[in-house]
Amino acid sequence: FSGPLYFLYKIISTINLAKELKEKYPTENFVPIYWMATEDHDFDEINYFNFKGRKFRWNKESSGPVGRLSTEGLDDFFEVFSHELGIGKNAEIIKKMFQESYLNHSNLADATRFLANELFGEYGLVILDADDKDLKRFFIPYIKEELTQHTSHKKVLETIQELKDYTVQVNPREINLFYMENDLRERIIF
């Protein structure tokens, strides 16, 4: 489930920007990167898509990081969606891609990574998983600093002050880190 088309637009825009920058700066190389926000908790934002005027929703209980969600049960959804797709070459391509992405992978992160790679891998897209343990190891010094110094919070407050003539759209918190374990995702508060 990629949710609204925003998922695809973000990736396509990133690939196009990398191409434009390469044309403008031919001696430099630009790599399109898709940051998969697998630690996010907002399943309601991504558990559906619209097709032929109909909303297809994955009705599943969700808690914790969405990337860790099991894809178990999507075979029932696939049957309904397959029927709506009908027959034909394009329908078969979409069915195959859905099966390979969501029915052959055990969690949403792996399924989404596979789908994005199938669609955009030939354009040099690099996919980063925010919940990857090896990636998080590199982030440890920044996490420690954030916990003890509240660096991001201070910078955001400074920026808000500099842009005081504009309406604040998001109110910052002192710590924007979470403790995660299995299906648990809790904000860290001191």
Question: Which positions does each model-derived feature cover?
Answer:
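N-terminal targeting/trafficking signals and adjacent low-complexity tails
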Residues: F1-F190
